[in-house]
Curated annotation (Swiss-Prot):
CDD domains: YfiH
Lineage: Bacteria, Bacillati, Bacillota, Bacilli, Bacillales
NCBIfam families named in the record: peptidoglycan editing factor PgeF (TIGR00726)
EC number(s) from the headed UniProt entry: 2.4.2.1, 3.5.4.4, 2.4.2.28
Protein name as it appears in the record: Purine nucleoside phosphorylase SAR1163
Amino-acid positions noted as binding Zn(2+) in the UniProt annotation, renumbered to this chain: 79, 124, 141
Length: 263
């Protein structure tokens, strides 16, 4: 596949950014220790997996991306649209054990160096933000709820520079095979973007939705230039050999870890 995300042993990396001091990527599902399913590289401590497995996977990833896990930050995601400002004081949060810190946070941003923002995914959209000019990075977790409540707009509120200097990467997530019902479709039709561009009616109370397109449209609507938005072709629902899919695997699966950090 011709994509800016390049395969590595346990992750995909946005390779062209490495020379700019940005580490941006997402883990893949294979060659791990977890039974979600067998030999899975699960990165979530909040599912019924052995803590040892997660720690070993973290250590493996830290070595592969050359980013010490003591500098990672992980929030407790709740499918909302709250954004947290992260500093070096937060490094290590929820990495060894889960705590009450950063609870209810589905997006983070920082202007600090040597901080790796991380969150777990298994169909929802990882949205990465960066500006090398202004030394800014952010990461958002946008499922249908986060997309509908415009979590990307909430992140943009914390950007204190011209949006022409901001770049956004929309990472691997479910494809338009993901379906919603009439009630959810009606919610999306209240957004300030044309729902016809990302929702397709397939039958009674059945509508396919492309959450990647929806988030890209929202970002552009709020001032991020189209040419500054990159959307990967990778999809969790189409590439099960690489990714976990909560919906297709009926919840009995692991989670990938999306990450972004800057030197």
């Amino acid at each position: 596949m011709n994509d800016n995300f390049k395969k590595q042993p346990h992750h995909l990396i946005y390779e062209e950014l490495l020379q700019q001091g940005i580490t941006l990527g997402i883990t893949t599902r294979g060659d791990g220790l977890s039974d979600y399913p067998k030999n899975a590289f699960n990165m979530a401590r909040y599912i019924d997996d052995c803590p040892y497995n997660i720690t070993q996977h973290q250590l493996q990833l830290a070595e592969e991306i050359a980013f010490d896990r003591k500098n990672w930050v992980f929030p407790i995601q709740t499918h909302e649209n709250k954004v947290a400002c992260i500093t070096k004081d937060d490094i290590g949060t929820n990495i060894d054990t889960l705590t009450d810190a950063l609870h209810g946070i589905d997006a983070m941003y920082t202007y600090d160096s040597n901080v790796l923002l991380t969150m777990c995914y298994a169909d929802c959209v990882p949205v990465y933000f960066y500006s090398t000019k202004h030394h800014f990075i952010a990461l958002a977790h946008a499922g249908w709820r986060g997309t509908y409540t415009e979590i990307v707009k909430e992140v943009l509120k914390h950007v204190n520079f011209d949006l022409k200097d901001l770049h956004v990467v929309i990472g691997p997530s479910t494809s338009s095979s993901y379906e919603i019902n009439d009630d959810i479709k009606n919610k999306f039709e209240t957004l300030p973007i044309d729902s016809a561009n990302y929702i397709e009616t397939r039958g009674r109370d059945r509508h396919g939705i492309d959450l990647k397109k929806a988030n890209a449209a929202l970002l552009n609507n709020y001032g991020v230039p189209k040419e500054n938005i990159y959307t990967t072709a990778y999809a969790t629902s189409e590439h099960l050999e690489l990714f976990f899919s909560y919906r297709l695997e009926k919840g009995q699966t692991g989670r990938m870890l999306a990450f972004i950090g800057q030197q």
